[in-house]
């Protein structure tokens, strides 16, 4: 219908049509997983066929392997994205799949890779990219890739990738080409059919596509047909490509815009114009053009006529086996009326060549399907007639179940006789059309001349068949069925007397013999063909081998293979086809005699971990869910087999059952415990002797017997009986899952088993494991100590009984389930239980065994993740070779567990131990561990990529990273790429954790303490000290100094390597990623990112500059400043200051700091009391030439304390958060300055006259007064207390004291020194002293006459330190001295606009001056500023390091004289005492 309205569709309609059609096609593919899997297998078969046809000595280059691997990885990642429900994982796998598939999509289509056309790989990639964009809900890209697929490779897209889509989009446009081809083929076929002059073009048209006509062609006719089909296929391809480009232009063109030309509709022109209108009777497979079989690889044309003919014969045979139904979508267009004599017949004995199981036919040579025709087999062995041909197209799945109608019983005799005539008259080829055979123009006499030739071939075939009388298998999916008992006699003919026998053995009476297992007598559920050619039910042959037999049950040939082959899917499909045609008969032979524990039971495959001594086999991997085996829901009678080849005779079974009956009766009804115990032992013996016959198992699986065994477990105290009961139950569960369901239905049964396990019965662990309990059950019974005991202790062996699973293996599996279940708290608690039960050494030792190794690794991993402190315990005992062997041999899940385990294990608290462990990992194993990890990294799921990347990077950095390394590049790229996944916060967090652990600061408890270590470097060492205190308490070994030194050197070397690799990767790309992480709304992520960024910037400036510093500055500087502004955490702000510190020395940073200077200045002032780095940054900031300090300065008066009632404030002193004041009337007051607004908390009146001076040393306060005393005070949080009074007989005007002596100034010249015990000594230098300052054993005295005297307190001598230039007019006096950071600050009368000088005590020279026109009487200094108080109530403020004036503060009282000045220790507050008895408090923020 599309062909009728296609010319009336405008561009919008075409886009709508494309959207609907392609979207529907892609949606159907995404929904049908089985179809995708089947399609991938078929494409892989074509690749394999091409590989097999090439030169086997030719090596495939690594680059070619990489391209093919990328395609495979991309398809696998896409499948994972389709199957997962985790949106984070889905998007990540889609990104990875796109990256992999784009490699193949962009290949040059004109070239080849490993013999495979690039166009094929590119089209395959485009198909999967179309799936990918559909999953992303991007319809535009989805359609674009689907159309690109047809442009790149129209031929294989039409036959392999999207035949349904080609039919909908392109076939309606190809009618003229199909018409031309039909006419040309008609013309050729008219030359082949004798006396065909009376046939018109439309009469019997379908006969011209009959496959058998090709076989009658002459060589020159066959060559013409080949050229015709080649030209036909090329025409379809070219026009498909033309229309695909047109559709693509329509999708990309904007119909609403008139600027871009509207795409022109192309016209599909055939090589010649057809003369007749297209017939509706042309089958769809003709319209599809030539179709290349999968087994032909990519050879588009046969090499010779022989090859062509052989391909025809093989394809016809393949079609006979498949018995496909009509194309589900093309039936209406391809209906061919069936002849009354031509109906489908049933399949009996057939021969299938494994190479042809997936052949697809071309319209000229490989289209028609014939039931009942064989190749390479005696023709007279056939009992089926030749039916009318079915129609086949690429849309017919080779796995589609046939839906043929049942044959008419009245036609059997007629068909059989005809078949016999055809069979005996085949001469040139083994396939001739039924329609031609019935034609009157072809005489039987003309054909019968070849009877002798056929007879010779039949005899040869029969002799070959006699060597393998039943079946022969070449590979896991190929099967040849032979039945010599129904072939003709030795003279090569089959007599007509055999016809009744054929009818008697037809499908209507019983199943074909080859569909029935010779052991069980039942139709196959899971057939496997042994190396001897015999086929058995998988479960039956498993039990045959388990009983100790090593030969084939029928041929008695020894079996060399230890593992059963995979399911014979060819035979299984035939059986399924037969069952659908004969449902009643199939039900009779599948169910009636199938016991509950029959071969169809999948219970064996449900047990993932078995160590059963010749019992364990790989359960079949069913690729088609439609053929999944169904378990019976009720007990059935024992199967009765009458086959002469049956191994287990029914008489023997009945004998065992009769022997069991009295013991079963005792077990179920007796009240005598010893009698029941004896019955259990006898039942076990008989069960063992039955060689696990399924019928015996079914008999013992009755609920009453199960309950009797459980009662024995509850009542008996005999260990042998208990263990034997468990043996019986275990065997029954192994065979039939319903036994486990019976036990699980009663909670007390599990409680009984748990009690037995706790009482030391190791075998109870086996039964618990087989019952598959949930985590809640295991957790409720607290089985971990008992499970560890089972693993630790040597188990007693059961006499003559072999358990299906070793109890130790079962215990480990249960332990794994227990540790992996529950929440984080439960996992931690359970891991602690394993560690406290001393289970770690036992589990580590258990790794030597292959069985259960995966579970052991999983358990140890759970222990390390829950209790990181056990890593050292494991690392000191483990042998890593078993873990690496498990990694190399395991699947993706096992590899992921191994990688996580190794990644956790190397996170030790000692770098030297880590390196030793890494060397072991690197050197162990038969394969290159690093290369294996690299390959796994490229295909690992997201949840394991970070672990393997971290591990691979550490292995690579064991050597100095001087040269380029693909391992290092891939690992670092993976870690950094994870940091960019802002949509997946969990992945970002894991990446940050992995990078922090790479730094190497790991505590003995297994946690990273990089943050505490960085804070300690910044001067905030409380977190580090607290951590070390805990670590030392848990540390019992006394490390030698040499060992600690080696550890320190190893860690420093390691950190330099890590920092160099991370910083220099792709020109500092990690800093750009960290910039994004710092913007996260997650506080935890931002904190981890800040720690990592701080460490990297600190390490960056210890490495040679390669241009990365500029990248780090641009990426991080502004982000960390934002953190400084927004964070409320002290630790975060200190980390920011540490990260900023390296940038201060960079001139390019100064401009940025100028912008943020004012905002960060206040924060840094608050932080400097906690962090020395903050103080250093603040100092550097204030000294930057680009920063205007006057813009940073600000102050505010907080409060004014009015103490005027006590007179003038003569002295102030700050100590331990308190401000002490000395007043005119002798009162001393204490103010609490720990809060922003100080308040008076104490007032004392110890002195009777004015308190002239206050000073402190240590925790002592010293006060001097005009009352001729010096008092000593202790300072407490609530005030001061006088403890000593020294009466010195004279008034004291100035005091400097410590615990050894006191220096004071009285009325006369010089200074007096008092050592607290002897009489004061006068040091007279004939000058009046105005101020004092003490530094060590030196006393500096500010004297009249503009000079400073230096007194040596050890020798009591003095000398001149400084002498200034005196003026004739006015007095020049040094009013105040103060020492700060090895500098002496002197306040003097203003001379030449200079009123203060700064001296270096070490150099004894002037290093600066304070320029002001006012006399400075008092001075106060903090870490940043100098405050100078004048007598007119003004305080001048200077920058301490540069001695530049910043600002001035005017006292509120106007020109009040400033009598005292003091700043707090943090430099945040300024206290000013004045002559009017007030104390003003200023906040310097």
UniProtKB/Swiss-Prot annotation:
Enzyme class: transferase
Domain of life: Eukaryota
EC number: 2.3.2.27
Biased composition (Acidic residues): 337-353
Domain U-box: 510-585
SMART domains to which the protein is assigned, alphabetical: Ubox, WD40
Pathway as given in its UniProt record: Protein modification; protein ubiquitination
Transmembrane segments: none
UniProt xrefs under InterPro entries: ARM-like, ARM-type_fold, ARM_LIN, ARM_LIN_2nd, E3_ubiquitin-ligase_LIN, LIN_N, RING-Ubox_PUB, Ubox_domain
Job description of the protein: Putative E3 ubiquitin-protein ligase involved in the rhizobial infection process. Plays an important role in the early steps of infection thread formation and in growth and differentiation of nodules.
Name used for this protein in its record: Putative E3 ubiquitin-protein ligase LIN-2
Keywords: Nodulation, Repeat, Transferase, WD repeat
Mapped WD repeat ranges: 1194-1232, 1246-1283, 1409-1448, 1454-1485
Organism of derivation: Lotus japonicus (Lotus corniculatus var. japonicus)
Region (Disordered) location: 337-363, 384-450, 462-507
Catalyzed reaction equations: S-ubiquitinyl-[E2 ubiquitin-conjugating enzyme]-L-cysteine + [acceptor protein]-L-lysine = [E2 ubiquitin-conjugating enzyme]-L-cysteine + N(6)-ubiquitinyl-[acceptor protein]-L-lysine
Molecular function terms, GO-annotated: ubiquitin-protein transferase activity
Biased composition (Low complexity): 438-450
Polar residues composition-biased segments: 466-484
SUPFAM superfamilies for this protein: ARM repeat, RING/U-box, WD40 repeat-like
Gene3D superfamilies (alphabetical): Leucine-rich Repeat Variant, YVTN repeat-like/Quinoprotein amine dehydrogenase, Zinc/RING finger domain, C3HC4 (zinc finger)
GO biological process: nodulation; protein ubiquitination
């Amino acid at each position: 219908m599309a062909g009728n309205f296609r010319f009336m569709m405008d561009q919008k309609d075409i886009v709508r049509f494309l959207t609907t059609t392609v979207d529907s096609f892609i949606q159907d593919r995404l929904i049908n997983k089985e179809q995708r899997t089947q399609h991938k297998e078929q494409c892989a078969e074509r690749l394999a066929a091409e590989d097999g046809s090439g030169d086997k000595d030719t090596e495939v280059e690594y680059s070619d392997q990489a391209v093919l691997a990328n395609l495979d990885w991309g398809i696998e990642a896409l499948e994972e994205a389709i199957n997962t429900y985790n949106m984070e994982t889905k998007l990540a796998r889609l990104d990875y799949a796109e990256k992999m598939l784009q490699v193949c999509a962009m290949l040059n289509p004109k070239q080849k890779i490993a013999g495979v056309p690039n166009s094929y790989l590119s089209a395959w990639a485009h198909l999967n990219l179309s799936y990918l964009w559909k999953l992303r809900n991007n319809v535009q890209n989805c359609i674009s890739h689907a159309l690109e697929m047809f442009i790149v490779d129209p031929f294989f897209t039409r036959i392999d990738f999207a035949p349904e889509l080609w039919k909908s989009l392109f076939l309606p446009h190809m009618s003229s080409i199909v018409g031309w081809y039909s006419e040309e083929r008609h013309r050729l076929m008219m030359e082949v059919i004798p006396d065909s002059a009376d046939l018109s073009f439309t009469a019997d048209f379908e006969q011209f596509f009959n496959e058998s006509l090709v076989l009658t062609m002459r060589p020159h006719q066959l060559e013409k047909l080949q050229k015709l089909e080649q030209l036909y296929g090329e025409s379809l391809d070219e026009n498909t490509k033309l229309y695909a480009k047109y559709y693509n232009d329509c999708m990309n063109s904007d119909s609403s815009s008139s600027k871009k030309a509207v795409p022109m509709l192309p016209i599909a022109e055939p090589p010649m114009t057809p003369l007749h209108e297209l017939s509706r009777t042309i089958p769809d497979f003709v319209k599809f053009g030539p179709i290349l079989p999968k087994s032909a690889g990519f050879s588009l044309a046969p090499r010779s006529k022989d090859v062509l003919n052989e391909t025809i014969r093989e394809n016809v045979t393949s079609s006979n086996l498949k018995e496909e139904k009509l194309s589900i979508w093309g039936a209406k267009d391809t209906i061919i009326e069936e002849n009354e004599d031509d109906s489908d017949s049933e399949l009996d004995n057939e021969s299938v060549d494994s190479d042809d199981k997936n052949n697809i036919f071309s319209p000229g040579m490989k289209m028609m399907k014939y039931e009942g025709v064989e190749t390479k087999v005696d023709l007279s062995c056939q009992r089926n007639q030749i039916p009318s041909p079915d129609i086949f197209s690429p849309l017919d799945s080779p796995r589609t179940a046939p839906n043929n109608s049942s044959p008419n019983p009245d036609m059997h005799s007629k068909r059989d006789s005809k078949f016999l005539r055809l069979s005996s008259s085949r001469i040139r080829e083994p396939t001739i059309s039924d329609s031609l055979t019935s034609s009157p123009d072809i005489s039987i006499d003309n054909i019968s001349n070849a009877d002798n030739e056929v007879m010779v071939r039949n005899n040869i075939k029969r002799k070959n068949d006699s060597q393998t009388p039943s079946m022969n298998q070449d590979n896991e999916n190929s099967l040849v069925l032979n039945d010599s008992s129904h072939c003709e006699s030795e003279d090569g003919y089959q007599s007509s007397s055999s016809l009744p026998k054929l009818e008697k053995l037809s499908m209507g009476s019983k199943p074909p013999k080859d569909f029935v297992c010779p052991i069980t007598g039942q139709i196959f559920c899971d057939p496997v063909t042994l190396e001897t050619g015999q086929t058995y039910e998988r479960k039956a042959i498993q039990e045959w081998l388990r009983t100790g037999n090593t030969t084939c049950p029928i041929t008695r040939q020894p079996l060399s293979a230890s593992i059963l082959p995979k399911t014979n899917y060819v035979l299984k499909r035939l059986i399924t086809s037969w069952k659908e045609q004969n449902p009643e008969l199939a039900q009779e032979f599948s169910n009636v005699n199938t016991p509950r524990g029959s071969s169809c039971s999948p219970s064996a495959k449900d047990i993932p971990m078995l160590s059963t001594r010749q019992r364990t086999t790989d359960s079949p991997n069913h690729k088609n869910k439609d053929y999944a085996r169904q378990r019976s829901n009720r007990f059935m009678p024992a199967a009765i087999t009458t086959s002469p080849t049956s191994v287990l005779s029914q008489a023997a079974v009945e004998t065992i059952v009769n022997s069991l009956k009295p013991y079963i009766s005792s077990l179920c009804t007796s009240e005598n415990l010893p009698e029941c115990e004896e019955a259990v032992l006898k039942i076990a013996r008989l069960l063992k002797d039955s060689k696990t016959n399924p019928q015996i198992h079914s008999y013992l699986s009755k609920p009453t017997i199960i309950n009797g065994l459980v009662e024995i477990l509850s009542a008996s105290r005999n260990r042998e009986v208990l263990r034997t009961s468990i043996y019986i139950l275990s065997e029954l569960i192994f065979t039939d899952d319903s036994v486990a369901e019976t036990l699980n239905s009663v909670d007390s049964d599990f409680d009984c088993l748990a009690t037995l396990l706790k009482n030391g019965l190791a075998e109870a662990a086996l039964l618990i494991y087989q019952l598959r309990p949930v985590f809640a059950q295991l957790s409720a019974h607290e089985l971990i100590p008992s499970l560890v005991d089972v693993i630790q202790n040597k188990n007693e062996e059961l006499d003559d009984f072999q358990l299906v699973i070793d109890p130790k293996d079962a215990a480990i599996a249960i332990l794994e389930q227990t540790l992996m279940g529950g929440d984080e708290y439960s996992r931690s608690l359970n891991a602690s239980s394993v560690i406290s039960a001393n289970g770690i050494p036992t589990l580590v030792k258990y790794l030597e065994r292959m069985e259960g190794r995966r579970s052991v690794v999983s358990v140890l991993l759970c222990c390390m993740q829950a209790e990181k402190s056990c890593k050292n315990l494991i690392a000191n005992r483990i042998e890593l070779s078993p873990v690496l062997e498990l990694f190399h041999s395991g699947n993706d899940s096992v590899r992921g567990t191994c990688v996580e385990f190794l990644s956790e294990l190397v996170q030790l608290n000692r770098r030297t131990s880590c390196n030793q462990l890494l060397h072991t990992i690197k050197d162990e194993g038969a394969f290159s561990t690093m290369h294996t990890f690299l390959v796994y990294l490229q295909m690992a799921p997201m949840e394991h990529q970070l672990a393997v990347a971290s591990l691979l990077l550490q292995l690579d950095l064991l050597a100095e990273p001087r040269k380029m390394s693909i391992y290092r590049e891939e690992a670092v790229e993976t870690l950094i790429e994870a940091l960019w996944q802002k949509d997946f916060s969990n992945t970002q967090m894991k990446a940050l954790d992995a990078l922090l652990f790479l730094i190497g600061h790991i505590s003995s408890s297994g946690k990273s303490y990089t943050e505490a270590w960085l804070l300690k470097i910044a001067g905030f060492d409380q977190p580090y000290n607290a951590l070390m205190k805990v670590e030392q308490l848990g540390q019992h070994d006394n490390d030698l100094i040499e060992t600690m030194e080696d550890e320190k050197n190893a860690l420093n070397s390691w950190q330099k390597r890590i920092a160099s690799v991370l910083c220099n990767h792709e020109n500092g790309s990690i800093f750009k990623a960290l910039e994004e992480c710092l913007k996260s709304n997650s506080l935890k992520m931002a904190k981890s990112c800040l720690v990592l960024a701080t460490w990297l910037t600190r390490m960056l400036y210890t490495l040679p500059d390669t241009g990365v510093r500029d990248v780090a500055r641009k990426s991080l500087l502004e982000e960390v400043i934002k953190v400084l502004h927004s964070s409320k955490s002290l630790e975060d702000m200190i980390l920011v200051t540490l990260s900023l510190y390296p940038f201060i020395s960079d001139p390019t940073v100064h401009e940025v700091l100028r912008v943020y200077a004012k905002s960060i200045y206040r924060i840094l002032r608050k932080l400097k009391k906690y962090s020395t780095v903050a103080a250093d940054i603040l100092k550097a900031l204030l000294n930057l030439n680009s920063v205007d300090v006057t813009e940073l300065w600000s102050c505010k008066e907080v409060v004014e304390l009015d103490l005027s009632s006590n007179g003038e404030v003569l002295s102030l002193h700050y100590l331990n958060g308190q401000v002490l004041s000395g007043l005119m009337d002798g009162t001393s007051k204490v103010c609490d300055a720990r809060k922003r607004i100080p308040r008076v908390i104490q007032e004392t009146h110890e002195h009777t006259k004015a308190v002239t001076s206050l000073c402190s040393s240590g925790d002592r306060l010293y006060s001097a007064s005009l009352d001729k005393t010096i008092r000593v005070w202790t300072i407490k949080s609530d005030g001061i207390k006088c403890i000593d009074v020294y009466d010195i007989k004279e008034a004291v005007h100035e005091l400097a004291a410590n615990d050894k002596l006191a220096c004071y100034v009285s009325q006369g010249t010089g200074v007096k020194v008092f050592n607290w015990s002897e009489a004061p000594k006068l040091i007279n230098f004939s000058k009046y002293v105005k101020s004092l300052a003490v530094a060590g054993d030196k006393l500096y005295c500010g004297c009249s006459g503009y000079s400073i005297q230096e007194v040596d307190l050890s020798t009591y001598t003095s000398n001149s330190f400084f002498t200034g230039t005196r003026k004739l007019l006015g007095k020049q006096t040094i009013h105040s001295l103060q020492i700060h950071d090895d500098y002496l600050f002197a306040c003097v009368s203003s001379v030449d606009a200079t009123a203060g000088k700064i001296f270096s005590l070490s150099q004894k020279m002037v290093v600066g001056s304070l320029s002001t026109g006012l006399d400075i009487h008092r001075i106060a200094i903090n870490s940043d500023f100098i405050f100078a108080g004048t007598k007119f109530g003004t305080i001048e403020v200077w920058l301490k390091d540069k001695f530049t004036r910043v600002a001035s503060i005017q006292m509120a009282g106007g020109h009040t004289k400033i009598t005292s000045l003091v700043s707090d220790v943090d430099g945040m507050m300024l206290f000013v005492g004045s002559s009017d008895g007030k104390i003003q408090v200023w906040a310097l923020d």
